Amino acid sequence: MKPYLMIHDIRKEYFDLNLDQYRLTFDDGLYSQYYYFPLLKKHPAELTFFITTSFIKPGRARGQYAGEYRPYLKTKKYAYRTFIENRFDHFMTLAEIQELAAQPNVRIGVHSHLHDVILTRTHASKRKPLSPWKLERFENRPEIVTENWSIRSRLAFQGYDYKNDRLTRRSEAEWEDYIKYDTQLCVSWMEDNLGFTTDLYCFPFNEHNEKLISILRTFGFKQFFAARPGKSSEVNGRIDVDNLVD
């Protein structure tokens, strides 16, 4: 079987690669993935789009590639637009997702609803840079750029929370409730906006374990994806396309 390729925002250079030797997957639901669909639609394998459902807003279908390449957005740049400037124009609109979903060679999967994170305080002498892609809870909070905040991108999905200036692990029951809440939002969004559900799930931050997989299975998910499969034989690993570009 051909290996899976993991793609976020699309660069012009990707089209110089021999993409036909891969099965293409696209994370987050970015507009560039819709924009370049005319160049992708003849790909010999199915195209799989993993959308973060809370990022998809109502809106019309915009233009697609007709010879002009778009500027490439690094994840740090589009994260700033999303979570500091509260802009979502770099993600697909609902109309664009619906158009892609109707294509015969397209599969729609989910990448969680919130892509959630934890915000913590750090010591002034040990400040950590803002994570480039993990500010979902903190829209309209420009003060986090200058104050002593640390964005803990993976910890929410690892079962942690931050309360009373302390990073603590949720109880197993609390963590399960959190995962079920986020997943139900995904499933409901798919039903309400696309008229179908999906059995494809891509893990936020590549965080996965057997318990998480067992919970997701109760919602009907059967195929799981991450950048790395880890120890699980149930998870499809993927190659980051940027590792192939000089």
Functional labels for PLM-detected ranges:
Residues 1-26, 30-35, 42-43, 120-246:
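C-terminal active-site subregion of NodB/CE4 polysaccharide deacetylases
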Residues 2-122, 127-131:
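Active-site beta->alpha N-cap acidic-glycine motif
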